[in-house]
Amino acid sequence: SSNEMYAKAIFDTWKFDASTINAFGGEDSIKPFTKYQEKGIFIWCKSSNPSSQDFQDLNVVSGIQKPQPLYKTLAHKSIEWNLNSNLGLVVGGTYHNHLKEIREICPNMKILVPGIGKQGGDLRQTVSTSPENLIISSSRSIIYSENDKSNDNIKKAAKKMNSEINSFR
């Protein structure tokens, strides 16, 4: 399948440690990735951009469950699919209420959190909502923290972000 070739390129050729993926093709579309047991796989669940609601907030019916937003269905499915304990979710830091709901569904799953910093996600709310198993991404706030994009300034901004994260735990 195409996803088998994507997974092979990502993990075997390029030697990535983790990847974000789209699960809209269902379980068959993520199996080629999850079979790499030492690699992290993060399913897009609730992205940080405003128009994520166009699809991710739509109510869906799956099996015998009552209608619920697609992001909750993805969270429930990710538990079923996490056979190798290498699956996580992408949940935007711009939606801490959604993060709280998803954390209730998946209490121990790793969550990649984009949207902190330039996109307006609140770091304090995000960490206080879910203090454990978060991987917080604040790329633009770190790389473009000052006009001088030197390694020293990037390192300084990364250390500052790390200190802020730890202060809210």
Q: Model-predicted segments: where are they?
A:
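Short C-terminal domain-edge/linker segments immediately following a structured domain
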Residues: 22-23, 49-52, 76, 80, ...
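Short acidic/glycine-rich loop or secondary-structure boundary segments that cap or lie
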Residues: 28-30, 50-55, 97-101, 120-121, ...
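Surface-exposed amphipathic alpha-helices with a cationic face
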Residues: 34-36, 79-82, 100-106, 158, ...
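A C-terminal functional module that forms or caps the active site or interfaces directly
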Residues: 89, 93-137, 141-142
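Conserved anion-binding
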Residues: 1-90
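Electropositive phosphate-/nucleotide-binding environments in soluble metabolic enzymes
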Residues: 27, 65-68, 72, 96, ...
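C-terminal helical cap(s) of enzyme catalytic domains, especially alpha/beta-barrels
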Residues: 124-133, 138, 144-169
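Generic structural signal for well-ordered alpha-helices
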Residues: 7, 30, 75, 99, ...
